From Swiss-Prot:
Protein name stated in the entry: Glutamate-1-semialdehyde 2,1-aminomutase 1
Entry-annotated residues carrying N6-(pyridoxal phosphate)lysine: 267
Record's GO cellular component terms: cytoplasm
Main localisation: cytoplasm
InterPro entries: 4pyrrol_synth_GluAld_NH2Trfase (IPR004639), Aminotrans_3 (IPR005814), Aminotrans_3_PPA_site (IPR049704), PyrdxlP-dep_Trfase (IPR015424), PyrdxlP-dep_Trfase_major (IPR015421), PyrdxlP-dep_Trfase_small (IPR015422)
Broad EC category: isomerase
Encoding gene per record: hemL1
Family membership noted in the UniProt record: Belongs to the class-III pyridoxal-phosphate-dependent aminotransferase family. HemL subfamily.
Subcellular localization(s) per the UniProt record: Cytoplasm
Record pathway: Porphyrin-containing compound metabolism; protoporphyrin-IX biosynthesis; 5-aminolevulinate from L-glutamyl-tRNA(Glu): step 2/2
Length: 428
């Protein structure tokens, strides 16, 4: 494949934007390949400015659960645009999407719309602290909750130590109120609560860790979180920005049967437009302004275009949708295992609904330490070869791949064949 136009575009972009991008992963640095500039998408396919076609498993990092340019979504967006892009006042569209979210997400009795997943998690932590009157938040190693200061925190030395900044610019004073423990480790969480329980406002977790390459919870982990937070009077917060409506019809909390106090949403609920949301029990949500004294606001929150795209996306999802995803996922997982075994290359495949992660190691992968044992050099080689075969994968080992309703069995079979061809070139 030729990337001449993309390479030329990147040279210009680098003079205009830091690293030439507006989000770091788009620079493709971890796979040592030129950034690809996209032109358009249709269904399960995406096309770059050089005219190359790819089967798309990135799907804008998850939001496009119906694939690109879904006709129903696009048609209603045209209607919404004709009425205006934003009004700074409420619209009926907000009621429609809010009701749909409340109907489908077990924990949500009231919801507040925002403009991004990061905004949703940031506001949720403020609400948790304001509601409980406590300061500290527990998060898990390898889970990503957006780029707000209090969540860009890595673990300190030892179990349940106070956090240290994970990026320059994050003050240590903020970091000290975030505790990081290993994912899928209830014993570590218990130690954290034994030390700091009286000042822990909440525990935030991706119910399926999608930002270390798709790592599901082990048996009993989520219920254990529910039990421990209840015991200490802390709030359990599910960050379902990625898992929301991808793991199941009632999100990950419905799939696993564990109900948090608060839930963060994003990605799928905007259908490709900028949106986020957070919600939970009425008694907690009513502490948000204007009913309560915990402040939150946003110029474009609940804007009519995002509400339209979100509603028209979610309204097309049914329980049968997830049966279709499971069928495609079964074929892809079986094919990956077969092809990698053929070439004597170890692989671990993790799945959760329409989210799939693969690690180039023996496995299992249940936490960040194990995810880090994947062969990153081989992953980068694999990425480059798969792009040549017309398959667009996330350019990072620590991002999940996604399925859409637009993907077909033929797409999956072509993808499996592409892996076989790629491995034939890599493994000598």
């Amino acid at each position: 494949m030729r990337y001449t136009k993309s390479e030329e575009a990147m040279k210009v972009a680098e003079t205009l934007m830091p690293g030439g991008v507006n989000s770091p992963v788009r620079a493709f640095k971890s796979v040592d390949t030129p950034a690809i500039f996209m032109d358009h998408g249709k269904g399960s396919k995406i096309y770059d400015i050089d005219g190359n076609e790819y089967i798309d498993y990135v799907l804008s990092w998850g939001p496009l659960i119906l694939g690109h340019r879904d006709p129903q979504v696009i048609s209603h967006l045209h209607e919404a645009i004709d009425k205006g892009t934003s009004f700074g006042a409420s619209t009926l569209l907000e009621n429609k999407l809010a009701q749909l979210v409340i109907d489908r997400v077990p924990s949500i009795e009231k919801v507040r719309m925002v403009s991004s997943g990061t905004e949703a998690t940031l506001d949720t932590l403020r609400l948790a602290r304001g509601y409980t009157g406590r300061n500290k938040i527990v998060k898990f190693e390898g889970c990503y909750h957006g780029h707000s200061d209090s969540l860009l925190i890595k673990a300190g030395s030892g179990v349940a130590t106070l956090g240290l900044p994970d990026s320059p610019g994050v003050p240590e004073g903020i970091a000290k109120n975030t505790i990081t423990v290993p994912y899928n480790d209830l014993d570590a969480l218990k130690i954290a609560f034994e030390k700091f329980g009286d000042d822990i406002a909440g525990v935030i977790v991706e119910p399926v860790a999608g930002n270390m390459g798709v790592v599901p919870p082990i048996e009993g982990f989520l219920q254990g979180l529910r039990n421990i937070t209840t015991e200490y009077g802390a709030l359990l917060i599910f960050d379902e920005v990625m898992t929301g409506f991808r793991v199941g019809y009632h999100c990950a909390q419905g799939y696993f049967g564990v109900t948090p106090d608060l839930t963060c949403l994003g990605k799928v609920i905007g259908g490709g437009l900028p949106v986020g949301a957070f919600g939970g029990k009425k008694e907690i949500m009513d502490h948000i302004a204007p009913l309560g004294n915990i402040y939150q606001a946003g110029t474009l929150s609940g804007n009519p275009l995002a509400m339209t795209s979100g509603y028209e996306t979610l309204s097309q999802l049914t329980p049968e949708t997830y049966e279709y995803f499971n069928m495609l996922g079964d074929i892809l997982e079986d094919g990956l295992k077969r092809v990698f075994a053929k070439h004597n290359v170890p692989i671990t495949v993790n799945r959760a609904g329409s989210m799939i992660g693969y690690f180039l190691n023996e496995g299992p992968v249940t936490n960040f330490e194990q995810a880090n044992k994947s062969d990153l050099k081989l992953f980068a080689e694999m990425y480059r070869e798969m792009a040549k075969e017309g398959v667009f994968l996330p350019p990072s080992q620590f991002e999940g791949t996604f399925l859409s309703t637009a993907h077909t069995k033929e797409d999956i079979e072509k993808t499996i064949q592409a892996f076989d061809t790629a491995l034939s070139r890599i493994v000598k």
